[in-house]
Structures are given as C-alpha cells and as structure tokens.
Regions:
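Single-residue signature of alpha-solenoid repeat helices
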Residues: 279, 313, 353, 387, ...
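Long, contiguous interaction/recruitment modules in multidomain scaffold/adaptor proteins
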Residues: 149-257, 436-438, 452, 513, ...
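Short coil turns that delineate tetratricopeptide repeat
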Residues: 291, 325, 331, 365, ...
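A contiguous, surface-exposed recognition patch within enzymatic or periplasmic domains that forms
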Residues: 2-131, 139
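Start-of-helix register in tetratricopeptide repeats
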Residues: 260-261, 295, 335, 369, ...
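Residue-level recognition of tetratricopeptide repeat
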Residues: 267-268, 302, 342, 376, ...
Length: 903
C-alpha cells in the first residue's frame, strides 16, 4: 500500500519501471498489458519487487482485506524516501516459499522502508564522525482499509461507496474522546462530527454527499481536541504524469568523453557497491588524461585507504593537494588535507599528520573531523590543555560526535577536572545511552577518585549493556588507542578476557599491538602467541587498524601462522589478491595442518591466478586434513566438476562420504544430478522422493531441474518401449511439484518439451484429440533464442520442441522457422564477448569457482545450432555441434540427452 500520489514504481537499481497501481506493460517478465492492479498481492503471479518513486506522503503499509487489519509505517518522507514491497508471487512458486518462510503457511510479503535512500541499492554518504538519525513509527491498524494519509496520531481513508456516497474511516493510535471529523466538497460541508475514537474502536461512517465515483474535490480533515489538524487528505483530480525513465548502464571508461563523468560514474559505483564494475577503472582512466585531477586523486586515495593500502594512498592525496594549491595555498575544500592527515596517522607519521589535519580545519566543513584528529595526537603527545581546546572546537562543529565526547571526558580526567568530566558524561548519555566510551570513561573516573564500589557498579552495568559483543569492545578500544591511550585500551579489552580467556583472536592481537605501541615488545609477543592459540572460527578481520595489528604481530612473532592467515583474509576481501595469496602461502609454510588456509589458497590459485593444478592440490590436501567438513567436500566436488572429472568418479567419492553429503542440500542435489547423468534415473527418482529440500538464493531451480529431468528421461524411455500410459503418468508428475522439493513451479515456466512428449504419449494411445491439444500447447512461448543465465530464463531447447510440435501439427514451415532461428542465433553470437548484465543484483548461480562467460556462450551457441540442425534433419551437423557442447562441458545434461537423438 503506497501513498495515493505514487504513479510509478522502480525495480532494483531503477533498471525497470512500471506504472502504478495499474501496470500496463511487461514487468518481471510478466505481461500486464491488459491493465492489472499490482498493488494487490493476488494479482502478482511471479516473484516481484517494486519501489515507489518519490512521494510527498509520510507512510507506507499493507492491508489484509479478509481480516480488515494492516500494518503501517510512518516517517518523515524527506528522509524516509524509500518505500518497497517484495513478494515471491501468488503462484505455485510463491506459495512454496510461503510454506518455507511463514509460521502458518500464509502469504509472505516484505515491506521495506529506506532512510536517506529511495531505492535498493541506494546508499547515502556518512562523513567522518557524522550521525544520521530519524524517527519512525510502526503500527497495526484495523477497519480503515487502503489508507489515504497517516501521521503518528491518526490514519484516514475515504472511498466511494456508490450512489454518491462516501465511506469515511478513521483509526487513531491513542484514545481521543472528542475529535472533529470534517468532510467537505468545496464550500459544501458533507460531514462535521465530534467522535470518540480509540485503537480498539475506529470510526467508520458512510456519508451521502452526491460525490462522483472518483471523489473529485472531497477533503477529509481530522482535528484534535485542541483544534489542531491531526491528519487530512484532499482527493486530487486524476492527472496523467510522465513515467520516469529507467536507469541506464554505465559506459565503459574508454567510452566516456569527460573527466567529470568518469569521476561521477566511479563515485556512483562506489556508492552503490557495484558487484562487477570497478570504480577504480574510471578514476584511473580520468587520471590517465589528467594526472592532477583533484577529485579523482582524492577518490583513488580513499579507495586505497579502505583497502588498507595506506602508503599507496598517500601520493594520490598529495597530488590532489598539489593541484589545489598551485595558485592558492588556501584551497576551497579541505577534504584532501584531512584525508592525507588520516593516511599519515595510520602510518605513524603523527607530526606530518598534525600539519595536514590543521590545514583541513581552515575549511568549516572539515573542522569537526580535523580538530578531532588534532586532539587525538595532542593526547598521544600528552598535551592535554591544547587537546582540550581542539576537542572543544570539534564539538562546537559536531555536538553529536560521540567519540569526541568520550575524548573530551578523557582530557578532563587527565587534567583532574573530575566533576566536569562526570557532568559531560551524564550529558552525553542523555544524548546516546549506549555511548560505551563514555561509560568506560565513567568507570575510569570512579577508579581515579577512589570510589571503588561505584567503579564496580559502573563496570557491571557497562558489561551488561555490551552483552559480550567482542567487536564492540574492539571498536572502543581502538578509539582509545588512536589517541595513544594504550593502557586504557588494554584495560577495556581485559573486560573481555576476564570473562572468557578463550575469546576472539583479534582481542589478543589488539592487546599485543597496544603493548607494542607502548614499548613493551615482551608483553606484545606474549599476547601474539596467545592469539595464535585461539580458535580461528569466524575470525575475519575487517577493520583498518587490524591490518596494523596483524603486520606488527608478523614482525614481533614471525613464526605465528595465524596472523598471516587472518591478514590474507582481510586482503582477499579488499580485493588485494596478490597480497592475500602471499599471506596464505606464508601461513601454510609455517603450519600446513590448517585446512581453511589451504582451502582459501585454492580459491586464490583458481580464481585469481588461473592455476588449476595448485588449486586442486591445495583443496585436496585441505579435505584430507578434515574429512568431516561438508563444505570443503562440496567445493572439492565442484572443482572436480569444473575440471571435467568423470561422473562415475565424482559419484563414487560422494558415496564414500554419504554422511557428509546428507548434511547439505547442494551435495544431495549434485549426487542426484550424477545419477541422472549416468542414466540411473530410477535411483535419482528415489533419492529426490526421499528428502525434504530447502531452497536457497542462488540455488533456485536446482532440485526441480533434476526432478523434471529424471521424469522426462524415464518418460522418453517409456515412449521408446511403447509404455504410453507410464509415459503419461511420469509427465503428469511434472505438472505440480511435490512439497518435499521446497520449491514451486514458476507461473512463467516454459514446458514445451513436457507438452510435446505428452502429445507423443497420447498419440501412441490413439487419443488424437488430447495429442493435438498438447502439441498445440507445446508451440506456445517465445521463439526468439537467448542465452539463459537465470533460473527463470527460457531454456533454448524449448524452441526446439516448439518446432517439433509444429511438425506434428503439420505446419512444416513454422517448424523449420523455429529450427532456422536456432541455427542463425548460434552463428550470429558464437564469437560474442559476454559480460554479466550491469544491473544484475545476483549471479546466476552460487559460484565458488570462476566461470568463463565466453565459454558458456560458446556452449549455448553450439547447443542451439545443434538443436536447429537436428530439427532440420541434418544429424551429422547436429552431432558435431552438440558434441562440441559436451566437449566444453561434460556436465551439460540437455546436450547429453539430445546427443543420443543424433544417431
């Protein structure tokens, strides 16, 4: 339920657009050209997502007619621009997901709202130490129906009741004894009434006011007891609004004419966290044309900083500043100076960082962050009075810098101004009750004042509120360490260790690093050795400061294997693949008994170095070290699949580890697939029937594909043996998927092959009428070939069966048209350079090992050419092309199944 001024909706990334609420075009591959109200769940047969264009109303919600109840979200539309719904669709496919995702197997609808964003994905920016805040209300309501306007106090609706009458409905979130409900039509008052309303007793009335069906000119207003307007709505005359344009894919860097557009495109890719396009490519193209460009140098520096490459980032900030100050030593924008200060500070060059931070404060926009950076270095130097002055300047510019509030309290404590510090902490906790830095500072203050019991109480409350969240402890400890407060940082982390000595490894790396910075390398090594003995499970360093910690650990304790492993994880996530592989190799060299380091190396070798031999050796060793890890077994089998290992060999391995296979749906499906590929369809049939499957995103269509394949092949076998009744039974089993598959059939499912073989079966039974009906059904659908990337894309063999069906119906011209289209499509696109669609929100499969899309395209083109020639009766050419498919991909079931038809 979107506000009444929403006339259009966008898909993810604004890649597609539809009119709303009445859709009149194609959306999510479904034809709504008849005019369909897509605001109603019942009218959406396929998985569908849509997001409202900008609205001037402050609400979004949903309403269930049959129980006359709904859910509403209210927030200021100036910051809450995003209004979205997602459904799996009111079809067999969606209803299967209803069973998977809801407690009582009811319809599953996601309502989402976006703060400071209007689409998914659409991220806004957070500047250093910036706070973004908002207020939002979620509320249930009843009786009102499709809300026309809402505030936190009241919801209203008015709609035609026929014969000039208007239904008026009001729901209020609290009890009101006398609210005034006013309904007017121009100068005419249709209703003016004082009513008592509460959440349990909404007000609903039908008013006769000679209204037109579209309620033109009607205005409904609700006044509180004090006469203030609580909510109102004026029905606007219907007007034709232009549909907004869908977004366009970014051009390649070389195709963009202007440096500004290169910068803006790169910035967009960063902001949207684009999965396949790199912002760096656009910035570097710009710098290849103008190496001094301020914006692109600054952007490259920031990108490198976020990847932990501090030294690499420095020259880009310096180049940006050089350009800025060529004519004027006082630039308009202080950001490059601030970023240079941050970069230098992360490298330990505090003197030069101090100068850069100070220069950034010459610009008002960077004073809060710049003065905060200065105050941190002042604290590190022990210059408390100057630091207090700087942090106060920072807070003047950003009163809600919660890190700054903690740092000011620390300065006051260091200067002995305990009362002032405690007052600041109390004031800060009124702003943010969960400012744990201030709470820890309160503990330190109580301890410094000798108030031991109070300190114990503050500590207990802090630990209770922190809930053992080790990453939060690390964040606050890093804040202290960034200001040179290594003793305090270590004391905070001791709160974690005293509760559980066997804790997250990075706690001990942090303690070691703080000791090292404080000049105690003996203690540092002790902590680093301790960190090595902690469980590595779920340890994925992601903070920039953790790069410094792990580098120091590798220096102080060079024999520690895990520090290299953890840093490798960071580098791989930061797409610094060469560094990641080098770290993992060093880790394995020091300790070759940890399976995950070997597994990670296998990923790096295969996906980034294209070294299949080293990848295979590493992954096989990883599995040999831990034969209880079902995940590694799955990945090893997928690698064998990539390397074209024989089906029987792969199946034998899975059967040897049957207990592991049973732990994972993906392994079970792979086992079933192998039985199908080996022609053991009855075994595949039994395995599918014996398990309850749970679908996953990226795995759609996997188990249902094997369910269809084994029944199809068994039916074809029955047809060959003239067991036409058995063939009908098997093919009829594909009409509705059993619930144990966990997945339903898409409303858009193309079933030309099923219908064709049903026609053949009924033809064999002598039922000409049914045979013709199924042959006719088999001719339906698009006859334009296209490569199938996603589970809901049409598979190319469906067109082949359209052609066979036309032939059965005696229309050879249409049959040959289908087959020729397949051949021509393959010839035209065989040498295409294929890329993932710019707007793709997911990959077509849950890929572990990189896929070559150009090889996939060759597979597709050879297949369609082979099928085309098979239909045209040229079996020699058909066999040549389909054999090439099998040569490229021995696991291509469709190709293997049709290769037999070429003999």
């Amino acid at each position: 339920m979107f506000p009444p001024d929403v006339n259009a909706v966008f898909d993810h990334g604004k890649r597609a657009v539809s009119s709303f609420p009445i859709a009149t075009g194609s959306y999510y591959k479904w034809d709504y050209s008849a005019g369909v109200d897509i605001s109603r769940y019942a009218n959406i047969p396929v998985p569908t997502s849509y997001m409202a264009i900008n609205s001037k109303y402050d609400f979004v919600g949903g309403y269930e007619e049959h129980i006359k109840s709904g859910l509403l979200h209210v927030a200021d539309h100036h910051v809450n621009a995003g209004k979205k719904q997602w459904t799996w669709g009111n079809g067999d496919f969606g209803q299967a997901w209803d069973r998977n995702l809801t407690d009582e197997d009811g319809p599953y609808i996601e309502l989402m709202t976006g703060m400071y964003c209007d689409n998914q994905p659409d991220f806004t920016w957070l500047q250093p130490y910036e706070e973004k805040s908002w207020v939002q209300y979620f509320m249930p309501y009843q009786e009102v129906g499709m809300v026309k306007n809402a505030t936190r106090d009241a919801l209203i609706n008015m709609e035609s009741a026929g014969e000039g009458k208007v239904k008026v409905a009001l729901y209020m979130t609290s009890t009101h004894k006398q609210v005034r409900v006013l309904l007017t039509a121009g100068e005419c008052v249709c209703l003016d009434k004082l009513v008592s309303v509460s959440p349990a007793n909404p007000y609903v009335d039908v008013v006769d006011c000679n209204a037109s069906p579209d309620l033109d000119g009607l205005e409904l207003t609700v006044f509180g007891e004090d006469g203030k307007v609580l909510v109102g709505y004026r029905n606007a005359p219907e007007e034709i609004k232009p549909l907004p344009e869908a977004a366009k894919a970014a051009k390649l860097p070389k195709d963009i004419a202007h440096i500004e557009q290169l910068f803006l495109t790169g910035q967009h890719l960063e902001q949207y966290r684009h999965a396949t396009y790199s912002a760096m490519d656009y910035y570097m193209e710009a710098l290849s044309r103008d190496e001094g460009d301020i914006r692109c140098n600054n952007a490259v520096g920031l990108l490198l900083m976020r990847k932990g490459k501090f030294a690499d980032a420095q020259p880009y900030f310096e180049r940006a500043i050089k350009t800025q100050t060529e004519r004027n030593p006082n630039p308009y924008d202080g950001e490059p100076h601030y970023n240079l200060g941050w970069c230098l500070k992360m490298q330990g060059d505090n003197d030069r960082a101090y100068d850069a931070f100070y220069k950034s404060t010459w610009n008002a926009a960077w004073q809060d962050a710049g003065y905060f950076g200065l105050a941190q270095i002042d604290m590190l130097r022990g210059d408390y009075e100057k630091g207090l002055e700087h942090i106060e300047r920072s807070l003047i510019r950003n009163w809600h810098n919660h890190k700054g509030r903690q740092l000011k309290a620390t300065f006051l404590r260091k200067l002995g101004a305990f009362d002032e510090a405690e007052k600041l902490i109390a004031d800060s906790l009124k702003i943010d009750l969960f400012n744990m830095g201030c709470r820890f500072e309160a503990y330190l203050l109580k301890s410094a004042r000798g108030m031991e019991q109070d300190a114990v109480n503050v500590k207990a409350e802090l630990k209770e509120m922190m809930r053992g969240a080790v990453h939060a402890y690390l964040e606050y400890a890093i804040d202290y360490a960034a200001a040179g407060l290594y003793e305090e940082a270590s004391a905070l982390l001791q709160f974690v260790v005293e509760d559980n000595e066997r804790t997250y490894p990075m706690v001990y790396y942090a303690l070691g690093y703080f000791s090292s910075l404080a000049g105690d390398e003996v203690a540092a090594k002790r902590y680093y050795v301790k960190a090595e003995s902690m469980s590595p499970e779920y340890c994925f360093p992601n903070k920039l400061e953790e790069v410094l910690m792990l580098n120091d650990a590798m220096r102080v304790n060079p024999d520690g294997a895990k520090a290299f492993y953890y840093l490798g994880n960071f580098w791989y996530n930061a797409r610094q693949y060469k560094d990641a592989i080098a770290c993992w190799e060093a880790s394995v060299e020091k300790d070759d008994t940890y399976p995950t380091a070997l597994r990670n190396l296998a990923l790096g070798y295969y996906n980034k170095q294209k070294d299949t031999g080293k990848a295979l050796a590493a992954l096989e060793k990883a599995f040999a070290l831990d034969m209880t890890d079902a995940r590694i077994l799955m990945e090893l089998d997928q690698l064998y699949k990539k390397l074209k290992y024989p089906h029987r060999q792969r199946l034998e391995m899975l059967e040897r580890h049957a207990e592991l296979v049973e732990q994972r749906d993906d392994l079970c499906i792979e086992r079933i697939t192998l039985y199908n590929q080996l022609g053991e369809y009855e075994r595949a049939y039994d395995l599918i029937n014996s398990r309850k499957f749970h679908p996953w995103e990226g795995g759609e269509g996997k188990v249902t594909g094997q369910y269809l394949f084994c029944r199809m092949e068994l039916a074809k076998k029955a047809l060959e043996e003239q067991r036409f009744g058995d063939a009908v039974r098997l093919l009829k089993e594909t009409e509705k998927y059993p619930e144990n598959l966990g997945e339903g059939k898409l409303t858009t499912a193309e079933e030309n092959d099923v219908h064709y073989y049903l026609g053949c079966a009924y033809e064999g039974l002598g039922d000409t009428e049914r045979a013709c009906r199924y042959f006719s059904a088999a001719t339906r659908g698009s006859d334009e070939p296209a490569i199938a990337f996603f589970y809901n894309d049409q598979q190319p063999d469906k067109i082949f069966y359209q052609g066979l069906a036309w032939r059965k119906l005696g229309d050879e011209a249409k049959a040959r048209s289908c087959f020729n289209k397949l051949v021509k499509h393959g010839e035209k696109h065989l040498f295409d350079n294929v890329k993932i669609d710019y707007f793709a929100v997911s990959l077509p499969d849950l890929l572990i090992w990189d896929d070559d899309l150009n090889v996939r395209n060759k597979v597709h083109c050879n297949l369609v050419m082979g099928l085309g020639y098979l239909g045209l009766g040229d079996k020699a050419k058909a066999k040549r092309f389909i054999s090439e498919v099998v040569n490229l991909d021995i696991n291509h079931q469709v190709a293997v199944a049709h290769l037999a038809m070429c003999d």
